[in-house]
Amino acid sequence: MKVRASVKKICRNCKIVKREGVVRVLCSDPKHKQRQG
């Protein structure tokens, strides 16, 4: 899980999801998981 100021889709499988006010990127590739912080 990378914590970044700006989260971006890295590949076409990445999805941007907002959970409890936190923006996250979910992907089939675990290296692409991010959250905004």
Curated annotation (Swiss-Prot):
SUPFAM superfamilies: Ribosomal protein L36. It comes from the Bacteria. The keyword Ribonucleoprotein applies. GO terms for molecular function: structural constituent of ribosome. PROSITE patterns: RIBOSOMAL_L36. GO terms for cellular component: cytoplasm; ribonucleoprotein complex; ribosome. Pfam families: Ribosomal_L36. InterPro entries: Ribosomal_bL36, Ribosomal_bL36_sp. GO terms for biological process: translation. Keywords: Ribonucleoprotein, Ribosomal protein. Coiled coil: none annotated. NCBIfam families: rpmJ_bact (TIGR01022). Belongs to the bacterial ribosomal protein bL36 family. This is Large ribosomal subunit protein bL36. It comes from Mannheimia succiniciproducens (strain KCTC 0769BP / MBEL55E).
